[in-house]
Amino acid sequence: LKKHRELDLRNQASTNLFFQEERPDYVVLAAAKVGGIQANRTQMADFIMENMQIECNVLSAAHETKVKKLLFLGSSCLYPKEAEQPVKETAILSGSCEPTNEGFAIAKIAGIRMCEYYHKQYGDNFISCIPANVYGPGDDFDPQTGHVISSLLARMHYAKMNHLPK
């Protein structure tokens, strides 16, 4: 397990070298450029480009080194803005993405499709799942740039620590 500062998955040569040296049997691709609504709104090109770079580099390296199984983590934000609730996986690409995170969503959709295509074309055991919402260590808890859940937790913690009204 490597941190971003140890391995930049946006760099194809570094990614290939890591896979060639480590020869992992199983890969969980959870790495992504992520951010809250404001970051997604102002860095659309960065979100689609960096996430596509990560996905292309990792899937290609996993294929070349014959990884036994790869799990790609999608995102609930890739569903259309007006998807029927409760949302079903078949809703992907059935409508327009939420404009505030469209770049990120399109990259995640591409990652899911790449897993499917590697499986169909080469027989690679690349699968994907779409977790509802996650947070934890290393998440961005800043109310201006973080995701909703982590930002709300940070705001509640701040209010409690500073004895602010509920």
Regions found by a protein language model. Give the residues of each.
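Conserved Rossmann-fold NAD(P)-dependent oxidoreductase catalytic core, especially the SDR/UDP-sugar
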Residues: 56-101, 127
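A short beta-strand-loop structural module common to alpha/beta enzyme folds
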Residues: 1-7
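Active-site helix of classical SDR
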Residues: 103, 107-110
